[in-house]
A protein has these predicted regions:
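N-terminal Rossmann-like NAD(P) cofactor-binding subdomain of oxidoreductases
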Residues: 1-199, 204-206, 298-301, 342-346
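Short beta-strand or tight-loop elements
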Residues: 127, 227, 291-293
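Short Gly/Pro-enriched turn/cap motifs at secondary-structure boundaries
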Residues: 203-207, 234-236, 284-287
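C-terminal active-site/capping subdomain that shapes the small-molecule cofactor and substrate pocket
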Residues: 244-346
Length: 346
């Protein structure tokens, strides 16, 4: 039985980790970490865990935690994991970090976009970017996993097959993304109050969103070219879900059938990436509560541009589900263990 600890278990991503791991036959959660609810019953914070989780919330003492568990999930704001991780910790436990601390390989880029100083840059190179569909073999032997961001996961998986095939101009990519309000976290903010978001949709972080360099870096690796994108996220009045519609110029003449064959080949063996039938657009309602990503592609022959689409649950494949997928690989378990729950509808 794998013993797990969660730092940040009372945030939305942390609570989703708890929900998934409670149904995982090979895992026991030993530590429910929370800075805000120390010594309070976890089930008093999340009533859905009543009579399911008897544990009390603890602090974020990583040194103590690593003496009690095999794997630590850090579902915390940027800067915390990098301030806690050490060689001593990594010699004892596996770390799966859901923050951005170890996703971006260039420390100057991280500090510029996130506006904080990185506390442990010596571990950046070692950290493995935890997108299982691309880095599966590297993940299996890692000590430190950088769990990808929600927007980057959906954006990358929507674009990846054509980027890898060298069929799109990597400096022409435009990513239009929309997310439910849980993506903004559980902290109290006026901008996220019901009356502020209901019956409205807005763009935010225009030309400045912190996920931009992460998407660019991963697309650059995939294509072997420098990727420079326009990324514009939007907040929509729903709890969960991300919808990505991305556009790019083609560099070769191809048919839609040829584009579809590239996607089919890229994802035919991927359990959690569902390439939809021709003419079917991804929808967030068909992936809610699941670890699935639905993708599709459409050729605009008139403009010679390609439209790449994706939908997923930002809290599952965009955070907790992907973290569990990484954990399964780290411990030699079937990658799908604990993650085959079908999407919830309605």
């Amino acid at each position: 039985m794998i013993k797990a600890g969660i730092i940040g278990s009372t945030g939305y991503a942390g609570q989703e980790l708890v929900r998934i791991l409670l149904g995982h036959k090979d895992v026991e959660i030993k530590w429910y970490g929370s800075r805000s609810y120390i010594d309070q019953a976890y089930a008093s914070v999340f009533q859905n865990m009543f009579q399911l989780v008897p544990n009390i919330c603890k602090g974020e003492d990583l040194e103590q935690l690593c003496e009690e568990v095999d794997v630590v999930f850090t579902a915390t704001p940027q800067g915390l994991c990098s301030s806690l991780v050490s060689e001593n910790v990594l010699s004892k436990v596996k770390i799966i970090d859901l923050s951005a601390d170890f996703r971006i390989k260039d420390v100057d880029t991280y500090e510029k976009w996130y506006g904080i100083k990185h506390q442990s840059p010596q571990f950046i190179e070692e950290a493995v970017y935890g997108l299982c569909e691309v880095n599966r073999d590297k993940i299996k032997n890692a000590r430190l996993i950088a769990n990808p961001g929600c927007y980057p996961t959906c954006s990358f998986l929507s674009i990846y097959p054509l980027a890898k095939a060298g069929l799109i101009d990597m400096k022409s990519v435009i990513v239009d993304a929309k997310s439910g309000t849980s993506g903004a976290g559980r902290g109290a903010k006026v901008a996220n109050l019901y009356c502020e978001v209901n019956e409205s949709i807005k763009a935010y972080g225009v030309a400045t969103h912190r996920h931009t360099p992460e998407i660019e870096e991963q697309l650059s690796y995939a294509s072997g070219q420098e990727a420079v994108i326009n990324f514009t996220p939007h907040l929509v009045p729903m709890n969960r879900g991300i919808l990505v519609t991305a556009y790019a110029n083609l560099v070769k003449d191809v048919t839609e059938e040829e584009l579809r064959k590239i996607y089919e080949d890229a994802y035919k063996d991927e359990q959690f990436v569902r390439f939809l039938n021709a003419g079917v657009c991804p929808e967030t309602r068909w992936v809610e509560g699941s670890n699935y990503v639905d993708v599709n592609v459409k050729l605009d022959e008139r403009t010679h541009r390609v439209i790449m689409m994706g939908a997923m649950d930002n809290l599952v494949k965009g955070a907790a589900g992907q973290a569990v997928q990484n954990m399964n690989l780290l411990f030699g378990l079937p990658e799908t263990e604990g993650l085959l729950m079908p999407p919830v509808f309605p």
